[in-house]
Design a protein with these regions (language model features):
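The conserved Walker
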Residues: 40
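SF2 helicase motor core recognition
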Residues: 123, 338-353, 372-374, 385
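Walker B beta-strand of ABC/ABC-like P-loop ATPase nucleotide-binding domains
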Residues: 162-164, 338
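Conserved SF1/SF2 helicase motif Ia
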Residues: 28-37, 47-77
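Conserved glycine(s) of the Walker
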Residues: 43
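A short hydrophobic beta-strand->loop->alpha-helix junction that borders the nucleotide-binding pocket
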Residues: 68-74, 99-102, 117-118
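Helicase-associated low-complexity regulatory tails and linkers flanking the ATPase motor
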Residues: 15-20, 54-60, 78, 82, ...
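Conserved pre-motif I regulatory segment
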Residues: 1-37
């Protein structure tokens, strides 16, 4: 039994996943695709773990199978593994494995192997230590390779189910040939907020694919994610001439953070909104031209504004983490976090509400995954507390990307980002004595009742 109760939309998704999975299991085909589309912040991992755990308790269904859970980093692999422990504590009937457990030589019934996709598809020799060399003379004297694990599992007539997290990132031709074809799983569960592949009607009718989708509006109504994203882009910044664009971005972001902090305080909430600042991955290239890096610009600006760098600023770069302990807590004193791509996916900090994103130096690429870091709502179980504070139910992006370069994930026609703000001019006054009325077209006489 889970320690947490699912929301209604999550229960429905878990039920649909189970029904679709069982339908594909009965198919004679292999590599059947079950595509699970669910918005960022909807609890995809929560739903997946409950779906997998639920297979252990189905009446009249107890087939011999094991799972391989694919992520694209070691950190995310461990996060997914830890979620199982968090949700089910001692009630889990699945053994949770990592590459350290290769020594058992195979996957037992209901085992779940969590593994970093990059360690399986990398072409670099130093990163392919998990794969069996093509030259037998290069094989290690003892231990098991990934191929050994798969072969030994099948020798016991045990099926394998693959779960590919963030499948839109990983399902390349290389991944297909070097991993999926090797595993030859019975079912592949592709999980993504923005899947590249969605089964067509013919595939569904043939029984080789299924599609389960969660509506964004259901997630918003449950209070898990913010309603919309407000965006200020390069075009908006150029409408404010006479200011350095880098510093203008910081000024606008800080002002917004202060406004949000004031609103939280007025509600009696001990929530400190966080600004996350994404620096260019190629920030170092500015040094070669004699320019200050964006990191230097940001740090100098914050220092100039009297912000205590040691107490209020966190850094998250490869091999460098400063002031990151407990930063996810709503009451954390950290106001700013600088990062590159590290926080792009899988990092949860609901109090992160303002994203400042600088363009890449050489080849501008807007990282849509990063937007997901400001989508989560800060207090899902207290959504009614915010009914009169719409600003607190929004996320905010300040960027020097152009408007047509900004891509907000899972943005439907009903959920377009705010990019224009209209104001009435101060010199305009209401016109007294003018009234308006609404008359339906039927009453007006230009539209028939039919």
């Amino acid at each position: 039994m889970s320690r947490y109760k699912p929301f209604e939309f999550q229960e429905e998704a878990i039920e649909k996943l189970t029904k679709s999975f069982l339908s594909l299991w009965d198919s004679s085909a292999r590599k059947c695709n079950l595509v699970f589309k669910s918005p960022t912040g909807s609890g995809k991992t929560f739903m997946l773990t409950h779906f997998v755990n639920g297979l252990n308790n189905l009446p009249n269904w107890d087939f011999d199978k094991a799972f391989i859970w694919i992520t694209f980093s070691d950190t995310l692999a461990m996060q997914s593994k830890d979620k199982f422990t968090e949700y089910f504590n001692n009630n889990l009937k699945n053994n949770l494995l990592t590459v350290e457990d290769f020594k058992q030589g195979k996957l037992e019934k209901n085992d779940i192997l969590f593994i970093n996709w990059q360690k399986l598809v990398s072409q670099a020799a130093e990163n392919r230590v998990l794969r069996r060399p093509s030259d037998p003379l290069l094989s290690k004297e003892q231990g098991y390779y990934f191929e050994d694990i798969i072969e030994n599992t099948f020798k016991e007539n045990r099926e394998i189910v693959m779960i590919v997290d963030e499948s839109h990132t990983h399902l390349s031709d290389l991944a297909q040939s070097s991993v999926i074809d090797v595993v030859n799983p019975k079912i592949i569960i592709n999980v993504s907020a923005t899947p590249k592949y969605i089964p067509n009607q013919e595939e569904v009718e043939e029984g080789i694919a299924r599609f389960v989708s969660v509506k964004r509006e259901d997630v918003v109504n449950a209070g898990l994610i913010k309603e919309k994203i407000v965006t200020q882009t390069e075009e908006d910044l150029k409408a404010m001439p006479g200011q350095d664009l880098d510093e203008l971005l910081l000024t606008l972001a800080i002002k917004k953070r202060e406004e949000l902090a004031f609103e939280y305080k007025s509600l009696g909430k001990s929530i400190n909104p966080l600004i996350i600042i994404q620096l260019p991955n190629d920030d170092h290239k500015l040094k070669s031209t004699g320019e200050k890096t964006k990191e230097q610009i940001v740090m100098d600006f914050l220092y100039k504004k009297g912000i205590d760098i040691d107490k209020k600023v966190a850094l998250w770069f490869d091999g460098k983490r400063i002031n990151m302990d407990h930063i996810e807590n709503n009451e954390s004193e950290i106001d700013f976090m600088l990062f590159k791509q590290a926080a792009g996916t899988g990092w949860d900090c609901p109090r992160a509400q303002v994203l400042l994103m600088y363009r890449e130096i050489s080849s501008p690429t807007f990282y849509t995954q990063t937007v997901g870091r400001i989508l989560r709502f800060v207090e899902p179980n207290k959504i009614d507390d915010y009914k009169y504070n719409p600003n607190l139910k929004l996320g905010y992006i300040f960027t020097n990307y152009k408007r047509n370069e900004v891509k907000i994930p899972e943005q439907s026609e009903k959920n377009k980002p705010y990019i224009y703000t209209a104001y009435r001019k101060d010199i305009i006054n209401n016109i007294e004595g003018v009234y308006s009325d609404f008359v339906s077209r039927v009453d007006y006489g230009d539209l028939g009742n039919a």
